[in-house]
Amino acid sequence: MAKLSKRQKLIREKVDSTRAYSVDEAVALLAELGQNVKFKESVDVAVNLGVDARKSDQVVRSSTVLPHGTGKTVRVAVFTQGANAEKATAAGADVVGMDDLADEVKKGNMDFDVVIATPDAMRVVGQLGQILGPRGLMPNPKVGTVTADVETAVKNAKAGQVRYRTDKNGIIHAPLGNVEFSAQNIKENLEALVADLKKAKPASSKGVYLKKITISSTMGPGLTIDQGTLSI
């Protein structure tokens, strides 16, 4: 039997897998368990939803602007032209273009994290589906990345908007910040996400919708959150 590392021993000692934690308790515990990690760990959430992800009408796909962002610098590319190109640049977009930007994407030059497109640009972006799709970069109106309001879309992306959809098990995964965030900021980010998830509940979903909420750090364990401690 393999020997447990010091970190694994500490997790076994400190984490009670039979209980649910408040966000304050969970953030404090993740910070304690990550004291010897050599990089800034992210804090992420997994939300188990009461949906059947095999049914197209129960797939939950949306986006949330986290009030305190994710703690990461987000690079934004915008496919548009004319006055909208000027608006996108003024709003803080890192790259703006049309056919010229498409050519860069085809060459593999994709130094950006989010792609936004105006509806008229989709004739160009549509040809890039096989490149952008597998990377999770394909613009989609359901998450606000295909829009005529590029100014708001760019500002939201820069402010820490997270995009998500249920995986095959009906689970949503999203970042909430990092271990240097205060517990209050993590909590408010989580509450904003959960509020939007509730709005996105499919009409055909029956029974308990928010089945389980778990937060974790990059190298840490998953801690179940007591939903009664959230303002949702």
Swiss-Prot record:
Keywords: Repressor, Ribonucleoprotein, Ribosomal protein, RNA-binding, rRNA-binding, Translation regulation, tRNA-binding. InterPro entries: Ribosom_uL1_bac-type, Ribosomal_uL1, Ribosomal_uL1-like, Ribosomal_uL1/biogenesis, Ribosomal_uL1_3-a/b-sand, Ribosomal_uL1_CS. This is Large ribosomal subunit protein uL1. Binds directly to 23S rRNA. The L1 stalk is quite mobile in the ribosome, and is involved in E site tRNA release. Protein L1 is also a translational repressor protein, it controls the translation of the L11 operon by binding to its mRNA. NCBIfam families: rplA_bact. SUPFAM superfamilies: Ribosomal protein L1 (SSF56808). Belongs to the universal ribosomal protein uL1 family. Part of the 50S ribosomal subunit. Pfam families: Ribosomal_L1 (PF00687). GO terms for molecular function: rRNA binding; structural constituent of ribosome; tRNA binding. It comes from the Bacteria. GO terms for biological process: regulation of translation; translation. GO terms for cellular component: cytosolic large ribosomal subunit.
